[in-house]
Amino acid sequence: MPVPSPMRLAVTHEGRSIIYIPSPEYAVASGRLEPAWLEVFYNPAMEFNRDVSVVAASALRRTGLLTRSGVAFDAHAGVGVRGVRYAVEAGYVKVIMNDINPKASMLAALNARANGLEPGSYMIFNKESNSLMFHLSRERPTPVSLIDIDPYGSPAPFVDAALALSGKGTVVAMTATDLAVLEGGKARAAVRRYMLRSVSKTPVSKETGLRVLLGYVARVAAAHDKAVKPLLAYYADHYYRVYVAVERGARRSDSMLEENLGRLVYCPETGVALALSYAEDPASACGGSYVVAADPAWIGSLGDQAFLEAMLNIAVEAVWLGTRPRVEKLLNTLHGEAPLSPRSIYVSLTSVASKARVNTPKKSKVVELLRSMGYRAVATHFSGEGVRTDAPWGEVLEAVVKLGSSG
């Protein structure tokens, strides 16, 4: 491997970790850092993503969900900030950091040493991530507990290798930034990349995209005779982030597909979206015409409530997190949404009110009214004007019309 040329460095801090990064001197445009211009990729705007990751990694260890060794694998490490933080802040006994950029390998090693990691507690690779994951899946000198996929763009090209490397008790985490594709804005690309039959842009496409991603991961897992269970799945800023626990076995895989894969439909006459099994008729469910928002897609739960509660408890204690208030706010919202997320799509109040020709009511008032009617209802993290509820769409429409007409 050629020896990387020296680079000028700067220093920053995240959480409890000190991180050396390439000097941003020549990577600033219009007063903002352009991460792709750095000699080694580092995006300070993703600190929130990494803070959530550290809390999730800590919760996996604290709850016992991590049944394998305490080894974390970062497939696209960049400067090594995520892997280092897994060791320093989440207590992982070993971190494996990989990046195809040789300068990244050098910086990741520097950051590991700067944060006091012992030589045997980390490994650095300079490989194409898929080839390394397939290699480790065959060799597997050390079982991997947490596999983290955070590429530039779509995680789709890396899901197969990550699931090949996974075993019983492994958790696979991934970030997707190709939202225009996942949400149906680029339908042909979505069909190719995520193996969809159909996808369309709708007022609730933020959730559609996340469920498309989970559905793709589930189908790739099934090809390995494995099943996945979402522990945490969310939308923030310009990306999706999901964590799935892996189980082995063809029967588990079959059950997962049967119970959690279906189609998402949008009802244009009412503005409501539905998550339907393949046994359910979309026309009957919508009461008329419908648009297929995504097929196939994940229609099961978007999170594990006990795991989210454990994350919340850790976040409250983690006073060193730079984005702690935002982390707590997200986790509180996700904790409320989790039990309502199976077979449910959030309601866009703007869309429903527009179809009903009434003013858009306040979200808090809709939640209050639906609860008074005996249903569960919470705000969603996907949208500032969205509500998640177990109320039938007819009752939702009644609530929106009542409040929208009086306001």
Curated annotation (Swiss-Prot):
One of its GO terms (biological process) is tRNA N2-guanine methylation. Its EC number is 2.1.1.216. The keyword tRNA-binding applies. This is tRNA (guanine(26)-N(2))-dimethyltransferase. Belongs to the class I-like SAM-binding methyltransferase superfamily. Trm1 family. S-adenosyl-L-methionine binds at residues 50, 82, 99, 128. Dimethylates a single guanine residue at position 26 of a number of tRNAs using S-adenosyl-L-methionine as donor of the methyl groups. Residues 10-400 form the Trm1 methyltransferase domain. It comes from the Archaea. GO terms for molecular function: tRNA (guanine(26)-N2)-dimethyltransferase activity; tRNA binding. It holds the Pfam family TRM. The keyword Cell membrane does not apply. Keywords: Methyltransferase, RNA-binding, S-adenosyl-L-methionine, Transferase, tRNA processing, tRNA-binding. HAMAP family: tRNA_dimethyltr_TRM1. It catalyses: guanosine(26) in tRNA + 2 S-adenosyl-L-methionine = N(2)-dimethylguanosine(26) in tRNA + 2 S-adenosyl-L-homocysteine + 2 H(+). It is an enzyme of class 2 (transferase).
